[in-house]
Structures are given as structure tokens and as C-alpha cells.
Regions:
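Zn-dependent metallopeptidase/amidohydrolase metal-coordination segment
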Residues: 269-367, 386-400
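Midchain, well-structured core segments that form catalytic/ion-binding scaffolds
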Residues: 98-275, 281
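Divalent metal-coordination and catalytic microenvironments
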Residues: 13, 46, 75, 90, ...
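Acidic/histidine-rich catalytic neighborhood of metal-dependent amide-processing enzymes
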Residues: 48-118, 178
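Glycine/charged-rich beta-loop-alpha catalytic/anionic-binding loops adjacent to active sites
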Residues: 27-43, 129-133, 307-308, 347-356
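Phosphate-handling active-site elements
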Residues: 8, 56-75, 156-166, 379-384
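Acidic/His- and Gly-rich active-site-bordering loop/insert found
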Residues: 1-42, 51-55, 59-71
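Histidine-centered catalytic micro-motifs
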Residues: 15-18, 38-52, 104-110, 131-140
Length: 400
């Protein structure tokens, strides 16, 4: 954490910096070529996210000193967003309680103040313990933890029909118990994650998943326990501050691309198979009319600022611990293009862009937007008050 200045208002900038395993890739290279085979890479652009936030914090500090204005700037370094998260723990410890508002951004393929929020999530390891036995000679003496895991999966698959359409249940085997099929496995672990638009919906669905796990243990004569590994609140952008950031984005405009940038972006877009391109076009349909999309993809770097809709009620299906900050202080996360239109996240292509000139240009524009938005907000106490009243309507007066 970096802090400077004094007095009110207190501005928070959020940074992330974790990479993703297996996504090592040479900077700006449109052919898959890892720097280190199997190594980590910034497939979500957090190197840009963190650098942009820090640049904004330093620029705002210099502005306050030059103009002899009151105000405190706090830069929050937030690890592990791709895993268990950290912002919810920072919020729970009260570090956002005295922050008047917070701004952050995320590398994307379009330029916008995201009108849509993101969903809440909760994850846990389910641990089953049974009794080992010879699977051929004495199976009746065994109690299979692996069978319990399998039955839990069956139960959760039936549960999918009886949950809201917007909910999701994901799972992955953490420890199947062993590799010998002639052993009744006495230990097995499976990880589950549950998503839904609101925290209350996640909690309700997670309780049902736990009940399924209990049933699986009962059917197999095993014992079950679970350990919660992560939980993020849903993210809803503060509509009052979203309008401020949107205006600043329109004043500064999109990153300034060159013909070299456009050609490189087109090379990356050609790395995707036809089936993926169909999905990319569908995704971009949210931003472009059909007649606009073909023209946009001829030079596939976003050149416009897409509209901010403060009345938007839809949400993306992803999750972020920025949601927990949004329940503690008025928060806005916006997007700036750092990759070709429609580029797939968590990919080697995204790592290549994150370390390219295209990525750097997007990051610097994001830093300028955050700095200007912070200055504008600090100069308008009435806007801060309105944003905080909006927060109160959402959280009831305190971080849950």
C-alpha cells in the first residue's frame, strides 16, 4: 500500500498483479512461443492494471502538491485476484472505511465504463474420508471416498435443473485418492465453486451443494467436511461515479493507434479458429451493430468509447473481488482496450498483448482517465455525497 497527502477527500486506487500459470508468451508475438515452457504469464493483463493504477496515484499526488490542495491518495496493492482474492479481507479489516471513493480499471478489448456488474462466487474443498480395502478381495470392508465424490457430482448435476438460470456450479478434482483401481480409495477431495448474481443467492445455493455432499457421504458410509477457500461479493458499479468516469473517457478518447498497431492486432485475430471467431462476433454484438462490426474488425483495435448506461441491470457471468470494495466504498471499474477486438482472456494471446506497445498505450490512457476522474470527483463534494448515498442504499450503511 502506498499513501500520500493529507485530509479529505480520500481517494483509493486498486491494483492487481498476479499472473496465470501456463501462459508464458513472448511480448507482442502473434505465434505461440513461451518465454519459459509451462511458465506463468499475464494472460489477464494485471501487469498493466497495477502499473496504470500506480501511475494514476503518482500523477494525482503531483497534482495535489502543485495545486496546494487537500486530499489523501491511497494505492492498494491487491494480490491473488485470480485465486482466493484479497480485497474482501482488506474490506473486512476496515481499510476502505475512510476511503471516500475508489477507482480501478481492467485491460479489455473495448473502451467503456462497464455498465454491467459481475456475479458473486463462493468456493470450497469437499473432503471425504472412508476406509481403504482390496477392491477385488474385500471390497465389502471398504468405504470409498471416491464413490462419495462421484455421487456428489451426480447430485449436483441434478441440482442444476432446480436453480436459477443465472447461477453456475463448477467443480474440479483436487485429489481423487490414488491411481490404483484395485484399492478402495479412503480419501478424496473435490473443489466446487458456486456463482449467482447476489451474495444471498450464492449462500442459498452453496447450502444446497453442502447438503448434496452430506447425502453422498451418507450413501457411501464416509465422512465429509468442507473448507471454504474463497468468496467474492457481486460487483455493481456506482452509477453516480460511473457518469463522472464516462465523461472523462469521452474527453480523453480512446488510445491512439498506429497502422503498425492495427496490422499486429489483425495478425492476432487470425490466430483464432473459425468456431472461436463466431463466438467473438457474438460477444462484440453487444457493442456494435451488425453493419458496424465488419468495419471495426478490418482495423481490430477499439477506436470509440462505448455508452455507459446507468440503468443497466444485466451482469457478466464472471466474478471479481472488486465487488467487495464496491460494498465498502463507492467504486467504479472501467475498461480500456489493450488487445484486439474480441481477444480471448486468459490466453497466450492476451499475455502477448499485455507486454506489447498496444498494451502500454492502453495502460497509459487508463492512467490518464483515472487521474482526471479522481480530480473531477474530488472537486465536487456533492457528487461524492450522492455516490455515498447510493452506496448506503446498496449496503445498508456498512460492509456486510
Amino acid at each position: 500500500t502506498y499513501q500520500c497527502g493529507s485530509g479529505k477527500p480520500v481517494v483509493g486506487f486498486l491494483a492487481e498483479y498476479d499472473a496465470l500459470s501456463g501462459l508464458s508468451q513472448k511480448a507482442g508475438c502473434p505465434v505461440q512461443e513461451p518465454v519459459r515452457e509451462g511458465g506463468a504469464g499475464h494472460g489477464c493483463g494485471h501487469n498493466l492494471l497495477g502499473a496504470g493504477g500506480y501511475a494514476a496515484a503518482v500523477a494525482l499526488k503531483d497534482y495535489l502538491i502543485k495545486e496546494k490542495k487537500d486530499g489523501t491518495v491511497i494505492f492498494f496493492g491487491c494480490p491473488a485476484e485470480e485465486g482466493a482474492g484479497s480485497k474482501q479481507f482488506i474490506a473486512r479489516a476496515g481499510y476502505f472505511d475512510n476511503v471516500d471513493f475508489a477507482y480501478t480499471w481492467h485491460p479489455e478489448t473495448v473502451n467503456e465504463v462497464g455498465s454491467r456488474g459481475s456475479v458473486a462466487i463462493m468456493g470450497a474443498n469437499f473432503i471425504f474420508d472412508g476406509i481403504a480395502a482390496h477392491a477385488g478381495g474385500e471390497p465389502h470392508l471398504g468405504r470409498s471416498a471416491l464413490d462419495a465424490v462421484e455421487l456428489m457430482n451426480v447430485g449436483c448435476n441434478y441440482l442444476r435443473e432446480h436453480m436459477i438460470d443465472a447461477a453456475r456450479i463448477h467443480y474440479a478434482y483436487s485429489d481423487p485418492g490414488g491411481t490404483a483401481p484395485n484399492v478402495v480409495q479412503s480419501h478424496a477431495v473435490i473443489k466446487y465453486e458456486v456463482r449467482a448474481p447476489k451474495v444471498s443467492q450464492v449462500q442459498e445455493l452453496f447450502t444446497r451443494v453442502v447438503d448434496v455432499a452430506r447425502g453422498a457421504a451418507l450413501m457411501t458410509g464416509t465422512k465429509m467436511k468442507y473448507e471454504i477457500t474463497m468468496a467474492f461479493s457481486d460487483y455493481v458499479p456506482n452509477r453516480t461515479l460511473g457518469a463522472v468516469v464516462d465523461q472523462c473517457m469521452r474527453e480523453l478518447g480512446a488510445p491512439e493507434w498506429t497502422e503498425v498497431d492495427y496490422r499486429l492486432a489483425a495478425e492476432f485475430l487470425r490466430t483464432y479458429p473459425r468456431t472461436t471467431m463466431v463466438g467473438i462476433r457474438e460477444k462484440l454484438g453487444y457493442y456494435f451493430e451488425p453493419e458496424e462490426l465488419d468495419a471495426a474488425l478490418e482495423k481490430p483495435l477499439d477506436r470509440v468509447i462505448h455508452p455507459f448506461n446507468p440503468k443497466e441491470t444485466a451482469y457478466s457471468s464472471g466474478s471479481t473481488d472488486v465487488g467487495d470494495v464496491g460494498y465498502a466504498t463507492p467504486t467504479v471499474m472501467f475498461h480500456v482496450a489493450t488487445a484486439c477486438l474480441g481477444n480471448v482472456g486468459h490466453s497466450w494471446q492476451n499475455t502477448a498483448f499485455a507486454c506489447s506497445d498496444i498494451g502500454m498505450k492502453g495502460m497509459l490512457r487508463a492512467a490518464e482517465i483515472m487521474t482526471l476522474a479522481a480530480i473531477r470527483t474530488m472537486d465536487q463534494p456533492a457528487v461524492i455525497a450522492k455516490a455515498r448515498e447510493e452506496l448506503k442504499q446498496k449496503n445498508g450503511g456498512s460492509y456486510h
